[in-house]
Structures are given as C-alpha cells and as structure tokens.
Regions:
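Glycine-rich, positively charged N-terminal anion/phosphate-binding segment
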Residues: 1-88
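Glycine-rich, aromatic-flanked loop segments that form ligand/cofactor-binding clefts
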Residues: 33-49, 93-94, 114-117, 121, ...
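Conserved radical SAM core fold
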Residues: 41-47, 75, 98-112
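Short glycine-enriched, charge-decorated loop/helix-capping segments at active-site entrances
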Residues: 53-55, 109-115
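Glycine- and other small-residue-rich loops at beta-strand/loop junctions that grip anionic moieties
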Residues: 70, 113, 117, 148
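Alpha/beta enzyme core
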Residues: 79-108, 118-168
Length: 168
C-alpha cells in the first residue's frame, strides 16, 4: 500500500503518521472478509479529544463496514466515547476489548482483568450497549456491540464462561 510505512505488515504497531491500522492491513491481507476491527482505542483519549486517537478512528472511505475496538474501565466514559463515535458517524460496530493480557492494561483493572470484576464488567457492557442503541436510533441505524474476551487472566482466574453469559 502506498501509505504504509516501510516494513509494515498487518501485525505491526501503527505509526500515527501512517493513518489507521486498517489502511495498512486491508491491502496486505488476502482474505475475503468484510470486517476489519481497529487496534484497541482508549475511550478516555477519545472523550478528551486526543488527536492521535481521533486519527486512529477515522475510517478509510474504502471500508465497507467500519468496526472499532474500544477499551476503558469507566462506564460513563465508555458510554460517552461510544456515543461520540456513533454521532460522528465513525463506526458501524463497536467491539469492547476485555481480552488484552498486557500487564500495563491489566494492572489498571482493564482488558483481561475486567471480567474478573463482574459488576464492573456488566456495568461497562450495559452502558456501551445503551449508548450505542440511543445514538444509533437518533442516527437511524443499528450499532452492534461485541466483546473480545480470553479464557481468563491466568489459569487460576478463568472468566470466559461467566463473561460470555453476562454479555448475552
């Protein structure tokens, strides 16, 4: 792809100057899939108007379905970020990241650690689903919400079954 940084591939970490991860990955992935999800985007950075984050969520005009992976630990901030994404017509689908195993994320109680905090997990899900439903109704479209989960934080903290049941 002409706008891909030298040496980039579908799994590389994005250079903020190169645009969204999808612009690099889509031309390099030989697959018929029509849905490509962004790399994890922090809800707080979206709500605070961080320019790098806003650049990451701007969809490419060639995308048929715009899907965004959202991360956060505060239900109100997550709901505001989801509402903003729908109102600005930046996504057609929101995927909540409850699967990131990186210690930097799990130490803050996010990613794969969130399903362990069942009440917070359910509050986050409910707040984002409600926000997407309300903003989607105002925009005249339906915004599906999905979740990314892992088996658990580690082998002694398996949460996948409870998380999946809660997310239904």
């Amino acid at each position: 792809a002409a706008d891909a940084p030298p040496g980039a591939d579908a799994s590389s970490q994005m250079d903020p100057e190169a645009g969204t991860a999808r612009r690099v990955a889509i031309p390099r992935v030989d697959a018929p899939a029509g849905l490509y999800v962004t790399e994890m985007v922090t809800s707080r950075a979206l709500v605070e108007g961080n320019e790098r984050t806003l650049d990451m969520v701007r969809p490419d005009p060639a995308e048929r379905v715009r899907s965004l992976q959202l991360y956060g630990v505060d239900p109100a901030v997550m709901a505001r970020a989801a509402t903003m994404l729908v109102e600005r017509d930046l996504t057609d689908h929101v995927d909540l990241n409850f699967g990131c195993p990186v210690p930097k994320v799990t130490k803050k109680g996010g990613g794969a650690a969130l399903p362990w905090k069942r009440d917070l997990f359910v509050d986050l899900l409910d707040s984002v689903v409600r926000a997407c439903r309300k903003a989607g109704e105002r925009a005249g479209r339906e915004i599906p919400v999905t979740v990314k989960i892992r088996i658990g934080i580690d082998s002694s903290h398996e949460t996948a079954t409870d998380a999946a049941l809660s997310a239904q």
